[in-house]
């Protein structure tokens, strides 16, 4: 165990923990957009930046990536931190000026208008946090989408912007997306997972008991093979089992 100081509070932490983990365990709020406790730390959004001091020197670090160490002093809302977060929110608001999640978070940090508004980001919702890509790979065990291109053309997409054979229609990407950039609709026995520049449709499995459509056939077949389940295991939905 090590002892650190966050905003004047002396706290004990395990050596392998990050500053963000310790802060959350102790009810100290640090904003994030790209972090999830079930995924490996990524440090994309930088909203979780804090100011650390040790040995008379201070610097700004991403709290989701920085491991705690004995005697570390952390400030989560110093003038440097607040200024840094405001700049990040200005850039995010410039990219996603009409997204309600970003507008609300920006407003909380005192940012009401973006400093500029490029036309190539018109109606953009994706903040490039990478949550969808990492969830697909780390949790689902697939690689249906990835971050492609560079600079202002950076975006999330399947290979060649074509429906990916790796996509099973589970919808985990849509569920984890913090801004609604990826969407999922179920209608008339079909599921559609889509974003701004790509989409894929899936046939839903129909329960043999209640007759309701309840999950994509590709997803169920993937699970069945992975767990070596009987061929008829998913003929009945969970509600009717």
Regions found by a protein language model. Name each.
Residues 57-166, 185-217, 224-240:
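Fe-S ferredoxin-like electron-transfer domains
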Residues 10-17:
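Short, contiguous acidic and Ser/Thr-rich linear segments
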Residues 161-175, 179:
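Loop-centered beta-sheet repeat module
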Residues 17-21, 67:
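Short, structural beta-strand-to-alpha-helix junction motif
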Residues 20, 26-50:
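A basic, amphipathic helix-loop patch mediating RNA/tRNA/ribosome contacts
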């Amino acid at each position: 165990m090590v002892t650190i100081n966050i905003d004047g509070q002396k706290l004990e932490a395990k050596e392998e923990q990050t500053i963000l983990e310790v802060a959350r365990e102790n009810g100290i709020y640090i904003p994030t957009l790209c972090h999830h406790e079930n995924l490996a730390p990524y440090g994309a959004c930088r909203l979780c930046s804090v100011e650390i001091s040790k040995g008379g020197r201070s610097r700004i670090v991403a709290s989701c990536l920085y491991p705690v160490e004995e005697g570390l002093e952390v400030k989560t809302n110093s003038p440097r931190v607040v200024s840094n977060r405001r700049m990040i929110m200005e850039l995010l608001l410039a990219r996603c000026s009409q997204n309600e999640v970003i507008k609300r978070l920006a407003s909380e940090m005192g940012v009401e208008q973006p400093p500029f508004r490029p036309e190539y980001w018109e109606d953009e919702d994706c903040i490039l946090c990478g949550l969808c890509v990492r969830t697909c790979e780390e949790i689902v065990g697939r690689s249906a989408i990835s971050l492609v291109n560079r600079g202002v053309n950076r975006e999330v997409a399947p290979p060649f912007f074509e429906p990916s054979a790796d996509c099973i229609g589970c919808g985990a990407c849509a569920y984890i997306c913090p801004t609604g950039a990826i969407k999922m609709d179920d209608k008339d026995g079909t599921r559609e997972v889509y974003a701004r520049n790509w989409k894929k449709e899936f046939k839903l499995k129909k329960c043999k008991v209640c007759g309701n459509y309840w999950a994509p056939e590709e997803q169920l077949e993937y699970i069945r093979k992975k767990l070596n389940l009987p061929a008829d295991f998913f003929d009945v939905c969970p509600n009717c089992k």
